[in-house]
UniProtKB/Swiss-Prot annotation:
Gene Ontology biological process terms from the UniProt entry: 1-deoxy-D-xylulose 5-phosphate biosynthetic process; glyceraldehyde-3-phosphate metabolic process; terpenoid biosynthetic process; thiamine biosynthetic process
Cofactor binding, note field: Binds 1 Mg(2+) ion per subunit. Binds 1 thiamine pyrophosphate per subunit.
PROSITE patterns: TRANSKETOLASE_1 (PS00801), TRANSKETOLASE_2 (PS00802)
Protein's UniProt name: 1-deoxy-D-xylulose-5-phosphate synthase
Assembly with partners or alone: Homodimer.
Residues at which thiamine diphosphate binds: 84, 125-127, 157-158, 185, 294, 376
Keywords recorded for this protein, A-Z: Isoprene biosynthesis, Magnesium, Metal-binding, Thiamine biosynthesis, Thiamine pyrophosphate, Transferase
InterPro entries documented for this protein: Dxylulose-5-P_synthase, THDP-binding, Transketo_C/PFOR_II, Transketolase-like_Pyr-bd, Transketolase_BS, Transketolase_C, Transketolase_CS
Amino acid sequence: MTQLPTNPMPATPLLDKVDYPDDLKKIDDRDLPQLAAELRAEMVDAVSRTGGHLGAGLGVVELTIAIHKIFDTPHDRLIFDVGHQCYPHKILTGRRDRIRTLRQEDGLSGFTRRAESEYDPFGAAHSSTSISAGLGMAVAAELDGKSRNVIAVIGDGAMSAGMAFEALNNAGALDARLIVILNDNDMSIAPPTGAMSAYLARLASGRTYMGIREVGKKLTAYLGKTVDRAITRAVEHARGYVTGGTLFEEMGFYHIGPIDGHSFDHLLPVLRNVRDNAKGPVLIHVVTQKGKGYPPAEAAADKYHGVNKFDVITGAQAKAKPNAPAYTSVFADALTQEASLDDKIVAITAAMPSGTGLDKFASVHPSRCFDVGIAEQHAVTFAAGLAAEGYKPFAALYSTFLQRAYDQVVHDVAIQGLPVRFPIDRAGFVGADGPTHAGSFDTTYLATLPGFVVMAAADEAELKHMVRTAAAYDEGPISFRYPRGEGVGVELPERGEILAIGKGRIVKQGNKVALLSFGTRLADCLLAAEDLDAAGLSTTVADARFAKPLDHDLIRQLARHHEVLITIEEGAVGGFASHVLQFLAEEGLIDGGLKVRPMVMPDIWMEQAKPEAMYARAGLDRAGIVSTVFKALGQKHGVGLGAAG
């Protein structure tokens, strides 16, 4: 690991006076720029020590301060979409003393969480949920007869997802008291600046123009929708500038902006006006700069979205020397290689080109790589359309995000038997991002679908084989899963082999205990086998490769010639083990006394930690496997056995 210097803590005399949002209300507006600078320094220092999402939070410092100063949180509900931008919010809401535990074991979450603070009314991590949740809270307040503001802060990327527009449409129809702040940090033009634009923003959010809109609504009741549109356009012109807000106005929102999200002269009066005057749904378009105030992040916003620990002075990130190539990199290289040999191969990502490795693919095959944005549902059906026309689409998604498109997987892909390939990254525990990003369920929900081939790579060489196997398979949908992080260091073939569908492999032969692994727990199985052999328990280790179709011959062999059969997987109950147990029961292979023990993720939400610590806590490591075997045999765990020995 690169050694970083220990930088001194930043001086923050004004921030030191702020423990909770009520303290902000005591600070003069003229001192807020200093507070913003100190808050940025505190955030940069904290993330430099823990790693995390830096750029998004730096971009909303002024906005976060302004919201908490103007509104009455937690009585007023403040919801952050995704949550990458919530670090300044956490510092201002009683969690500054723990901010240097971000994303660490037993530390603060990197996202908003209801269980963590009353200032987090709704948890987040996946995108585009804030407006729906906020609308629910706004309607609940109306039903309860309570006067309460609900503010949803959503980025321009998250706004591209269909769920956000579904919520906007419903909010406009209900005319609910909801404030949506569109944080636009990817605008191609500079935000409006200067006294005139600040004046116009105040004017547009004030009582006069909001009153014009109310008159327009009443006229519409008598004169129809056409007149309403004309009034909307007239109001836009009366504001004195073209806002681009016509779409939101058509959906029933009062639109304000764009305004400079780094100017308190813009933010404070607009938020005050909206708080005091607005009725119905309001959308405030705020333009910000990702990474604002920290030069390395401003210069390379993409590289400072999510960061490792880094040196505050230089911005240099700590990087461990790799022992083996990362699974994501192996996948990307293998797919790029296959695409060079087959011009029907295309790749699809949902706003994660770097995370899935498809940026590598795109650099070689730019016309055959499609980033569809934060739109997993569309990504899957788009892939289905390509498959229907004879192409070989690889829809590369994280396991946790594939959940968002399950109906499309079932209805548009599986029922039609279309050969869409699903490379599933971030399988199993992912570490610092915690339960919201764990790849726990894909085997369970895919292997239940008729005609679906479900694979898991045991190591990086197996991953190359599975990429080629998927490219060659045209009989229906096929998936292969692999984890975050480095491989185990096996030798990589020049090109992957085409695997026989539904066939596993024996890696080590024994005769008393059988360990049947699905996925990268294979390495721990081999280590556990060393301990078991040393204890006189001859152990077979097998790599299933496939959860569907199962290798029936392999399972019969293991069941008939061993006293104990353990299945191990990096997934929830209902996955690989359930299919194995179903087969064993149907075949009568457990009637003769075979001791079968499934090892799966525990039925809890596993909190953030390093992945190896999470697997140990789950009992899915070397020591856990050895312990499970001894318990199955009714024996005490031998002294010195397992990883903990």
